[in-house]
Amino acid sequence: MPALKIPLFKMKDMILILCLLKMSSAVPAFPQQPGIPGMASLSLETMRQLGSLQGLNLLSQYSRFGFGKSFNSLWMNGLLPPHSSFPWMRPREHETQQPSLQPQQPGQKPFLQPTVVTSMQNAVQKGVPQPPIYQGHPPLQQAEGPMVEQQVAPSEKPPTTELPGMDFADLQDPPMFPIAHLISRGPMPQNKPSQLYPGIFYVTYGANQLGGRGDPLAYGAIFPGFGGMRPRLGGMPHNPDMGGDFTLEFDSPVAATKGPEKGEGGAQDSPVPEAHLADPESPALLSELAPGALEGLLANPEGNIPNLARGPAGRSRGFLRGVTPAAADPLMTPGLAEVYETYGADETTTLGLQEETTVDSTATPDTQHTLMPRNKAQQPQIKHDAWHFQEP
């Protein structure tokens, strides 16, 4: 019997030791510091890295106002109190930097008494009552004051003018509606770095497909006075007079090589009859009647064509496939037809437009490619750009 009892006692001791080891590993040896109830107990540096307003927040990826905003969705929904009600998110001048070496923030006065400010901030965060500081009064009044006033005064409302670095409105209890408190306070006076992307606005695919017609609708609400978003390599502003003056036609592949430039008379190209203007299949009329639906599909939205190679002055240098300008004008110079590329006849039929019209140099005013009166003023500019800027 004693031989059987000795292993049992050893087993009990071993079980007891194992239970103690298990309990010691489960219960933390160092008790955590008491924090705000309901919040996770993290270290001070970790919470400052997480919730600091000095840089980008880790929670800012859930923000509805973009990256790096100080108001993310948790604070906007009212799930958390305002930022500075947490003691670890308050400005920290007294730990790592001397107050004299700290950069002054705009709109704030320089520190009058740095040691007094530091001592009061330490006392306020610790919650220890402290005798008030009388900066405007002589020390005789402080000595004459009763002792009760020295214990009651700091708990009510410390003087706000002597402490520009602290926001004492936040030392009170957090309000019932933290979002209203945040909005009423305005932006935080932190030295927040400028964001990498000031604002990213997404425009729908349909507005981008319209070649520039849908841009005032899409961008105009965001940026007032926004003209057109047509691609301009030269940086020239969009000319509204050039909007609807050009009439681009589907030409035969020999249309750009014929005419007075090559020594042949233009009379052999018969002008387009006036009944062609009433044809609903005309590309110019289609772009006039339904500009929004066709400019994403047709190769020729009127005005500046979006996907063009632009010259240094910002104007068109070459047109798209199968489209040549109404180049047969008396103001045009010889050799302009070489600038524009010509393509095969199989690439000129778009959306079932089977008829092909030719450019006539002696165009009567009732033809399709009649130029508007204000377009005549723009023609020498296009001639000048195409003549001088022919580099690739």
UniProtKB/Swiss-Prot annotation:
Q: Name one GO cellular component term.
A: extracellular region
PANTHER family associated with the record: AMELOBLASTIN (PTHR14115:SF0)
InterPro entries attached here?
Amelin
Q: Any idea which residues bear Hydroxyproline here?
A: P37
Region Disordered: which residues? 86-109, 247-280, 349-392
Q: Compositional bias of type Polar residues: which residue ranges?
A: 359-381
* Family statement: Belongs to the ameloblastin family.
Q: Quote the biased-composition stretches of kind Basic and acidic residues, using this chain's numbering.
A: 382-392
Is-annotated flag, keyword ATP-binding? no
Per the UniProt entry, what is one GO biological process? odontogenesis of dentin-containing tooth
Please state the span of the N-terminal signal peptide per the UniProt entry.
1-26
Protein name (database record): Ameloblastin
Question: What is the recorded function of this protein according to its Swiss-Prot or TrEMBL entry?
Answer: Involved in the mineralization and structural organization of enamel.
Tell me which UniProt keywords the record has, alphabetically: Biomineralization, Extracellular matrix, Hydroxylation, Phosphoprotein, Secreted, Signal
Provide the positions where the record notes the PTM Phosphoserine: S43
Q: Pfam families, alphabetically? A: Amelin
Q: Where are the compositionally biased (Low complexity) regions?
A: 97-109
Question: Which domain of life, per UniProt?
Answer: Eukaryota
